[in-house]
Amino acid sequence: MKGYQTACRRLGVVALVGVLLAGCSENDRPLESPVRFEGGIFGTYYQITLVDPLTQGEANALEEGILAEMEDVDQAMSTYRDDSELVAFNDAPLNEWQPLSNELIEVLAISRSVSEASKGAFDITIGDVVNLWSFGPEARPEEVPSEAELSERMATIGFDAVEVDTQRMQARRLRDVFADLSGVAKGHATDRVAAYLDQEGIDNYLVNIGGGLIARGYRDIEDQTPWRVGIEVPQSGVPEAQHVIALEGMSVATSGDYRNYFEVDGERFSHLLDPRTGRPIKHQLASVSVFHPSNAWADAWATALTVVGTEQGMQLAVENNLNILMLVREGERWRSLASPAFVNYFGDALIDELGIEPWTASSANRQMQTGE
């Protein structure tokens, strides 16, 4: 009996060692490149593509870290979670300074900077008006609000009612406005994931969160093939690329009026609202892509420039040295306009190859003749 127990113990030890070895071999197993992580977050999707050589264990650890970065942003900036830091800020007493996390202060500061530079074309307090037009979480039918309803909601917005103290890392609301960071939080999450991958020593990757992109290194290390991104034709239906551009060590965010809208009596109402009027935009500028080292900045600027339209948008791009590409409706075709910073960054050869028009004084004159 004693010999039987000893044999059983030995068998158990052998079995346990076998399990441990199997676990080790699985973690050490090299994966085919590229490795992709995909899923849903912030009401949209994410796709992270890694080209560096990885084992299964390394990939598992990276995926866990990526999810933690995105969860941190959601915890800080979601307006759909009762436990988020932003919801607590919106519920805090008026005129009282609230200590906030570094990342929430950073995103509030970016938002304020773009709001001031665009003279209010970007405003994180527009949430109540977005809801009124049926594009927010508030359950409303898709209909045009009355003048009285719009006036009432417009009285509740204005970034001047949010003070941000970047020295003491605090902010406060001076009026009962509702701060909504959905126009920049996604870009901030893209930056966070990229920074995490940099920290972990990953050299070749593409981060895509809801269409906000950051590329590093190559998509094919051996051939040194750069990442290439498509700038969509700004129309509903199956996505189609108007231009394909190599993206190296840069991020891009695109804003457009063509995906999210509703129609009433044949008239289309875009989800992109002008915070200065409270109404959907009505001009021929269909999309703006902003290329910037930070996707949060690109996200905010893309929205602001799309709101103001072609001529004002290009003027802002020139004043702020922004690297942007616009797609403008001209009848049945699309006119592609590039800012001076875009031309300087990507070069004349690409401009000529893609048939993109550099913005000049004559471009402005033509725009005035054809109208927005």
Residue positions per predicted region:
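Mature catalytic core of soluble alpha/beta enzymes
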Residues: 2-7, 12, 21-372
